[in-house]
Amino acid sequence: MRVLPATLLVGAATAAAPPFQQILGLPKKGADTLAKPLHDLQEQLKTLSGEARHLWDEVANHFPNNMDHNPVFSLPKKHTRRPDSHWDHIVRGADVQSVWVTGASGEKEREIDGKLEAYDLRVKKTDPSALGIDPGVKQYTGYLDDNENDKHLFYWFFESRNDPKNDPVVLWLNGGPGCSSLTGLFLELGPSSINEKIKPIYNDFAWNSNASVIFLDQPVNVGYSYSGAAVSDTVAAGKDVYALLTLFFKQFPEYAKQDFHIAGESYAGHYIPVFASEILSHKKRNINLKSVLIGNGLTDGLTQYDYYRPMACGEGGYPAVLDEASCQSMDNALPRCKSMIESCYNTESSWICVPASIYCNNALLGPYQRTGQNVYDIRGKCEDTSNLCYKGMGYVSEYLNKREVREAVGAEVDGYESCNFDINRNFLFHGDWMKPYHRLVPGLLEQIPVLIYAGDADFICNWLGNKAWTEALEWPGQKEYAPLPLKDLVIEENEHKGKKIGQIKSHGNFTFMRLYGAGHMVPMDQPEASLEFFNRWLGGEWF
């Protein structure tokens, strides 16, 4: 049976997988050409010695197909750039950088920090009636262009349905790495979903009910985004996100004065600590960052990988998926996995982190996935193997590939795909998967509130592991936070007032939530509960 590396998709993951679930494989074209970068990488490994070389040898021995058939390169997307006359506004980063002001010391300084000269932001006001998505709500679409590196990130902005002059602004990020945030828009929390007739359906529980929301396709070559280059680590992607937000708020200062939050799921557990840290590192900025929210995230692998066996074997609140022998095999593999992750944490070297990712994903995620059970929802089987277990993802992709849809939003690529598995491999083979980005969270907690929430039916980024890493995190409030018990989280208003929707613990700027009856994508499975906690979080209830 062929075993392949993991993928956090939608923010969800597909680890070691037999043919019946989505796996990582070679592109249909150019396989021979794309295999060369990995061969070159393996040649470089011959210069290593000691533990690093031993780890690579061990991984290659256990999982030869991983090493032989997974390139670290991605093909550029076919695209046709629209003329500047198509866009309503083009914000030049060089113009933003050219603005100087007098600082408190009386010396001249830039109005806004950051290296923005190479960036432009293209903006088009989208006609909601053209697509029937949230008619009456102001919308903008466009691209952030990095002209030096030929990178072009697509975004779609929806104004708040309620009070856009005062409601906060939220950036939403799906995970992967390599999955489009437009999946989150149409499958989870956006103003419309797509039905089996490939038609948009109004979402009463959209997150833009009381907030303006930006959905961003990042990194490049994801969704409607494209590039001739590649981004293969989270830190590089953070520079692009800072540039996009800076130029967007420069064009729309009416939103810049409002509170801003970053939310996302799954691999956004990597993205968000980095992106928020990047924003906060710029003292002179026009981004009013107030908090971050991470749903069913992968943030601290060393802690979280402890909880795959318990979740799969009946200790997470749902019946066991695996038999005793499989559970024992996961127990047997865990010490070696943790040792490899510790080495990755200690060195942050790609040579150490890559084999840790491959070994641990195959050893601890593989047994579960080979059962055919949905890795994103422990309650059922994988229903649609061609669309990451969800038929709805296929509907979304079909809709976004319609010519009239691409024309209406100004998309420049010839086609849309929900997830780009080349990007996933790029991140994995650059060691990004296992790197300890959770170490940035204490710095965030010094300045802003952090919410970690988790649907309790998810396997891949399960609530047990997310709760555990928040309790293990070293920060000044750890002694007070860690021992706190979970308390009931209930709906406060409407006809369902008093209904239990989950559990919560909170101290200082740190909050953890368990959401009942939801898998990896909480807003899709529990739309009312997700909007309830989202609105209350933005309202500052727990900070």
From Swiss-Prot:
This is Carboxypeptidase Y homolog A. Its EC number is 3.4.16.5. It is found in: Vacuole. Disulfide bonds join C179-C419, C313-C327, C337-C360, C344-C353, C382-C389. GO terms for cellular component: fungal-type vacuole. The active site is at S266, D458, H520. The gene is cpyA. Residues 1-17 form the signal peptide.
